[in-house]
Amino acid sequence: MATKAQNNETRKVNKLRYAEYYGQQPILDGLYADSKDGRIFKNLMPLILSQKNILQAYRTMKGNKGSHTPGTDALTIENIEAMEAKALCTEVKRRLGNYQPSPVRRKEIPKPNGKTRPLGIPCIWDRLIQQCILQILEPICEAKFSAVSYTHLTLPTILL
């Protein structure tokens, strides 16, 4: 059984691999460098809505165990994986046009001490849209964090 650290490492490597596969890595590296140089970003929507970014977000999300867990709309990754790439991108763009997140499904998760903790499970489309946004904002934000703090960094940043 893989440890939590091994799972995190696998996730980081997959993230880098997916970015390279979809041709996003030069874009993400550019965002990081521009942010590091103090650039102010005004219109990121074209990057967020790009087909490459949407497909990378879908691939990243598809690899998560949680993608098989339904949100309040009862949909899972299986409901959207039959869509062709163009249709998937069109639907994400349509939903992002006037984006309002759906309510999350609440689930109580048992803790070892007998108590529970609340877990919010978003709808599959919200997860996909939020992943699209995260992929573009993450390198911009990472460039702003302290150079001596490594707890928040992802593998591509550490390797720079």
Model-predicted segments: where are they?
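A short alpha-helix capping/helix-loop junction motif
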Residues: 106, 143-148
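Non-catalytic, polymerase-adjacent accessory regions of viral genome-replication enzymes
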Residues: 1-86
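Residues forming anionic-ligand binding surfaces in small-molecule and nucleic-acid pockets
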Residues: 110-113
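Conserved small/polar residues in nucleotide/adenosyl-binding loops
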Residues: 151-157
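Extended, charge-enriched "interface" segments that sit outside catalytic cores
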Residues: 77, 102, 107
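Amphipathic alpha-helical blocks
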Residues: 79-101
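A positively charged, amphipathic N-terminal helix/segment that binds anionic biomolecules
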Residues: 35, 69, 102, 135, ...
